[in-house]
From Swiss-Prot:
InterPro entries: ApaH (IPR004617), Calcineurin-like_PHP_ApaH (IPR004843), Metallo-depent_PP-like (IPR029052)
Source taxon at top rank: Bacteria
Family membership: Belongs to the Ap4A hydrolase family.
Alphabetized UniProt keyword annotations: Hydrolase
Record-linked HAMAP family: ApaH
Gene3D superfamilies (alphabetical): 3.60.21.10
Protein name per UniProt: Bis(5'-nucleosyl)-tetraphosphatase, symmetrical
Enzyme class per UniProt: hydrolase
E.C. number(s) listed in UniProt: 3.6.1.41
Gene designation per UniProt: apaH
Taxonomic lineage from the root: Bacteria, Pseudomonadati, Pseudomonadota, Gammaproteobacteria, Alteromonadales
One MF annotation (Gene Ontology) recorded for this entry: bis(5'-nucleosyl)-tetraphosphatase (symmetrical) activity
Pfam families xrefs: Metallophos
Amino acid sequence: MAHYFVGDIQGCFEELQLLLNNVDFNPSKDQLWAVGDLVARGPGSLETLRYFRQLEGSGRVVLGNHDLHLLAVNAKIKRANPNDKLGPLLTAPDIGSLIDWLRMQPLYQELPEHNLVMTHAGVPPQWSLETLREEADHVAAALRSDDYLTSLICHMYTNGSNCWHDSMSELERKIYCINALTRMRFLHSDGRLDFDCKLPPSACEDPDLSPWFEHSGLLNSTHTLVFGHWAAVMGKVPSSTIHALDTGCCWGEHLTLWHLESNQKITQNKLKKS
């Protein structure tokens, strides 16, 4: 079995299909892992969700911030970003079943035989694998509940839960988990999440900020970590066991596919017409 990991698709469905054709992806024997943000800026968000849903066991997905935002937009809790191309998805006849499928997806995935963990934005340095499992599973349970919109989604738009500590309420822990696993980029020197700076690490001039993956972490010392989210990084991280797969396809750059077994990365430039 070949394991392929793809960066943020964001509705760039044609580029995804070109990549998969390039490597002769066969869902009967291969697996496709996606780092989240399946939807948003590209024109093929509907096709992307339908594709991963029909992959069933041959596809492994984690939720990204744009995927969670879609849940809020579909429920009219938030308005769609005018730069997103979600119209065909939001008006599709199967939008209800697609939303239900999406909210059943987790915030992390594991490949134990390779000591590999995948999330959308990364893993907080102070979290062990056990903490990641426990906190992310609590969020997943909330998303799968019938009242997920009122109990979780309508509360998640806050920057307040930016520092992990033992005295957090249950809801604060869930919001911190969402913020860390789907929005994290830079951390302050005391470990607080920073939500303002989205620059490439080399362009950040604030001495108190550094990328989360440059902090000494409990997981990145023992596991291979796969993440997306931060297109400005363009795949450049100072570790051979951390793979940054968002290479900005929806921003005019390219989509990246990583083949685990050969440790090769294959790219597809964004198509001009999309």
